[in-house]
Amino acid sequence: MIIYRNYDQKIDEKLIIKIKNYCKKKGNKFLLSNNIKLAIKLNLDGAYIPSFNKNTKHLSYSLTKKFIILGSAHNINEMNTKELQNVNAIFLSSIFKKNKNFLGFYKFKLLSHLTKRPIIALGGISKNNLKKLNLINCLGFAGMSFFE
């Protein structure tokens, strides 16, 4: 699954369509961040709602059953917001990376049990701590540095 996230520049629809076609050829799902309306218009596989987006306007949109909505959260309030936004799964961070949103292993585990939504672990996952994910309630993990 590929999520296109670029908050610094205006969205280039032609580029999004190129990436969509590439993902389709390779058998990958392609989601657009923070723009559900455009994801629907361009017939993408879904959309990603970042933690700072509290909007529920998309609940009135007509979506196909296959349309995926993912969201991210760093605390219980944001998790509740993602549930109100009716996301299919929640990226919860940060499990290992010590940043401003650092949860740590035990707080992450506790928060992951406070929702019925599938949880995807995020933040500082490496070859060294990958096995620890078997000890928590998560569907899987995501990252950038892990795959570099």
Task: Describe the function of each predicted region.
Residues 12-17, 83, 102-105, 131:
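Conserved strand-to-helix beginnings and helix N-cap segments that scaffold or border functional pockets
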Residues 1-63:
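N-terminal active-site wall of soluble small-molecule enzyme domains
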Residues 49-59, 89-104, 125-148:
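Glycine-rich phosphate-binding active-site loops on the catalytic face of alpha/beta enzymes
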Residues 61-64, 82-84, 109-115, 133-136, ...:
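Alpha-helix C-terminal capping segments
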Residues 41-51, 67-113:
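Glycine/Thr-rich beta-alpha phosphate-binding loop at enzyme active sites
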Residues 29-36, 50-52, 70-79, 117-128, ...:
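Glycine-rich beta-to-alpha transition loops that act as phosphate-gripper elements at the mouths
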Residues 1-3, 29-31, 45-48, 66-70, ...:
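Structural preference for beta-strand elements that scaffold enzyme active sites
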